[in-house]
Amino acid sequence: TELAARISSYQLAARMQLSVPEVTDLSTEKASTLKAYGADDATNPIKAGFAKNCILARRLLEKGVRFVQLFNGAYQTGGEGVSNWDGHKVLHQQYAKHGPVLDQPAAALLRDLKQRGLLKDTLVVWCTEFGRMPTFQKGASGRDHNPEGFTAWLAGAGVKRGHTYGATDAFGWKAEKDVATVYDFHATILHLLGLNHKRLTYYHNGFERRLTDVHGHVIKDVLA
């Protein structure tokens, strides 16, 4: 009944809120786990903060949360052009700061998920909004956006291990081998989640559009 459905939804909301303090309490984590992630790194509080977020992501997955998003790269680390990955300026300073923040915690998260048996049922999607140009940006010490060639990677449920798909030209500017679009990437993710992207349609401006616009194909070569 409608009443039962309402009661159930309120009960779910209550359980979600009541479980938050337990899930977010990292004091129950072993010292070895904190060290593995870099969450105890007093010399780099930004890295330690991201590491704690990675641990929290694992804890949410352990509680059955279906979707977890981690964000890296918007920190006050040196002013304009240095506080994120958007490398239009002072790229050498920028990536020297952000690389160490990301590297250890991200690797530790994958290892931890695997050791706990969670990775086989978890799809990890690691990506950005753009690649960077192989040349320096005019009038600046960084590199402009490059929509023609960039890297994303998948790990975990349903994908091949150690497999590379596609490549850019020798200059690093444009994808030329096994070219995949963002729509193909999304179609593949949806497939791994058990969804047929071609059936998720809605009518708009004369087209049956979908989450992959009006095109996109599953990249079968990356599937396990």
Language-model region placement:
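Ligand-binding pockets and gating/stacking loops
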Residues: 1-224
